[in-house]
């Protein structure tokens, strides 16, 4: 595993690079069960018919991933983000359970805004990393990757620890069109 510190869009974090050895179970078993579905984010995606920002069809991801080495670039939120996320989430749940739908709705909007900042930081680091390129993915630089990103709210141990899994299908790495 490799880790680097990042900052961007006014939000810091850590990016960890791991290799997928579980046939994507660590993300796909959570999709639409206790975590949202994935989102196509890599700059090479449109060349494969994958619209940026569209929901990931898990069957399509599995088919495209077959035979490819898979990298998981995990963006981990900084401590302050984690604390803010946890507080707003708790407040929203309390309002919901108390029957205060208006207050709960406002707090859910706040939570979406918090995640919007996280996604902005995640996109910024993906753009930077593709611009830099990783030799293990391809010798050409800069690169475009096919990436399926998955927002997770908790750690594998169930602790509040927001992070984004960015699954890179390394065999589909292409050279960026530099003008």
Model-derived features: positions:
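Intrinsically disordered, flexible peripheral segments
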Residues: 1-179
């Amino acid at each position: 595993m490799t880790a680097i510190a990042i900052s961007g869009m006014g939000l810091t974090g850590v990016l960890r690079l791991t290799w997928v050895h579980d046939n994507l179970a660590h993300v796909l078993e959570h999709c639409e069960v206790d975590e949202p579905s994935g989102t196509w984010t890599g700059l090479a995606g449109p060349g494969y018919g994958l619209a940026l920002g569209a929901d990931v069809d898990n069957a399509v991801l599995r088919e495209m991933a077959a035979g490819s080495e898979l990298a998981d670039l995990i963006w981990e939120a900084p401590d302050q983000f984690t604390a803010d996320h946890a507080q707003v989430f708790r407040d929203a749940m309390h309002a919901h359970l108390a029957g205060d739908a208006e207050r709960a709705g406002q707090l859910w909007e706040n939570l979406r805004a918090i995640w919007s900042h996280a996604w902005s930081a995640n996109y910024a680091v993906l753009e930077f990393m593709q611009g830099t390129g990783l030799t293990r993915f391809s010798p050409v630089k800069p690169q475009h990757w096919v990436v399926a990103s998955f927002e997770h709210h908790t750690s594998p141990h169930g602790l509040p620890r927001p992070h984004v899994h960015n699954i890179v299908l390394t065999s589909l790495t292409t050279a960026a069109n530099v003008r």
